[in-house]
């Protein structure tokens, strides 16, 4: 006969979670799930019609986890179908195609859609997100580099992984870390532990790196107007250099941003008497 202690231990081990996939059509959401659950890759594209549902069992941290996976269609046509499935979610697999930048730029829109459907009582800060930079096997056509994807993800406290559903690269590692984080979430009363949210860099640093990445010229990069004086250029440079120096800034892409700022200053000072 089971004791109360044994029953409590068993109930602690058993866990049921809900996971959804999000991202544009054709980024490989279904292929990532099939690669992990069925150990296979389906080369021919088959559009998800509305929602695909599956159940799998995994063992994480000495716990049996029953995972209910809702693979959501990425086409806007299916919005009225997928909007019913956002609530009561513990984990989200957010996918983009590294070869098509528009799928990366759509990630903010997916988050906005989820926030809208969760309503004022919803809180995505208490959901585990795993961002998959997918199709890294197609490196010849890559338009979103790792530092850009990692910066976007980590600035929001999301997990980030480079994956290939075709080769399987990064898939198992992603799911293991993803499920482990969800177990921690559930054990912490449905809230992400503080240690999981600490990202190691500021919003100002992340915003500056993104701005520098998209600047068209050296004036814009330093944030000064054409015709600025030598002192104004140096002042703007010093501010950014302190903010982004790789020894002090842990944000992905900080080293490249710092080098770009140094080069911008050098280029401008050459033309200022």
Swiss-Prot record:
Name a GO CC annotation attached to this entry: phagocytic vesicle
Q: Name the positions where GTP binds.
A: 23-30, 71-75, 134-137
Homology family: Belongs to the small GTPase superfamily. Rab family.
Q: Name one GO biological process term.
A: phagosome-lysosome fusion
A GO molecular-function annotation: GTP binding
Coiled-coil residue spans: none
Protein name (record): DnaJ homolog subfamily C member 27-A
Entries under InterPro entries matching the protein: DnaJ_domain (IPR001623), J_dom_sf (IPR036869), P-loop_NTPase (IPR027417), Small_GTP-bd (IPR005225), Small_GTPase (IPR001806)
Residue ranges constituting the J domain according to the UniProt record = 217-273
* Native species: Xenopus laevis (African clawed frog)
Q: Is this entry keyworded Lyase?
A: no
The transmembrane segments are none
Tagged with keyword Nucleotide-binding:
yes
Which gene underlies this protein?
Answer: dnajc27-a
Gene3D superfamilies this protein is in? DnaJ domain, P-loop containing nucleotide triphosphate hydrolases
